Amino acid sequence: MKKTFFPAHLIGTVSAPASKSEAHRRMICAGLTQGETMLTGFMDSADMAATMRCLGALGSTFNRDGDTLTISGMQGKIAKMPVMDCGESGSTLRFFVPIALTVAGGTVFRMHGRLGSRPMDVYRDLFVPRGVRWYMGVGADGAAELTVRGKMEPGDYVLPGNVSSQFVSGLLFALPLLPGNSTLTVQQPVESESYIRMTIEAIAASGIEVQESSAFSWRIPGHQQYRSRSCHLNGDYSQAAVLCCAGALGHDITVTHLSPVTTQGDRAILRHLMALGATVEESDNHIRVKAGKLHGATLDMHDCPDIAPILALTAQLAEGESRLTHCGRLRLKECDRLAATVEILNLLGGNAQADGDDIVLHGVKQLRGGVTLPNYGDHRMVMLASIAATKCEQPIEMDGIEAIDKSWPEYLKVYQMLGGKCE
């Protein structure tokens, strides 16, 4: 699907969608119980559907009533080698590999888009020496497939810290279910620490005990059971970051449903925007970011890589030079987001470059626009383009807009409600 985005002024109040990261985790905890759990504030997306399919393959059932999702946990016997379609969701795939080895003795994971090429060697290197059979192949329809067979056993597990935190979270979900005690150690320095803390928070809320013996080293008792714990899902700072950056660029947007008490690392968006010179007003779970005299800054993305593209746009329109550091993980997303961000900004008339794992931006006063952007197949690039267009002299065109369905299907409606123009 192709859309044209036009220069515009955005104004209004928006409720942040439910945190996708929290929803993944709470759904999995609910699915691993044998009871019923209600999650309110739930929002559909392609990634949520992927996690629901995988839980369904393990026997969970779902009922939707408005924004309330009721999950009935695993019931009855699990099919031998169930098939789990992960769509393009890296979180879903990496969370469920240890879970499937624990409760099903293996499975066939189906992967679409770039997911089949995203790194999985961390698990392969961890599990194959422990007797798990691991096979990457291609299904009859051309989709990538990963087949794993075997059982996880209690023991001492060590992961490097410079890999996706999703691998750590997958083990944290599964290890408490094993018939014996285990330890999990993540070697420092650790990437995306906040996401690990979010997983520990979610499993603890479901009655799982994890004992931190030292920094990034946990003792995890076995024979544990997940307990039902209904909750209201918090707003998503990762998605809200797009609107907060729009505010820093001169639009007048208030975002609600954002708790100041959160393990979401992407709350760093507020700190980073203030470092660029924006003003942040926060009260009663409402956030309003106002434009100041934006200036260059050095911003560390190691714990919040998902907000780097939209921050790069904001820094591109600030005076002076900015540098976004530790952006290497962007290369391993739905597209190479580091390269795509630099390419988009330069096509629009900016001055950006990749310097190793950093993005360097030389500020410009105005973006030109007037171009057709490639189809990146990435929801973050769609949101980046839509906000960039509001600050361009001429409209911009982009193909592959349907990628937005992966995380925020209602985004374009929200964008237009705020005054954004696209057709």
Go through the PLM ranges and name each one.
Residues M1-E423:
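Short, structured segments at the rim of ligand-binding sites
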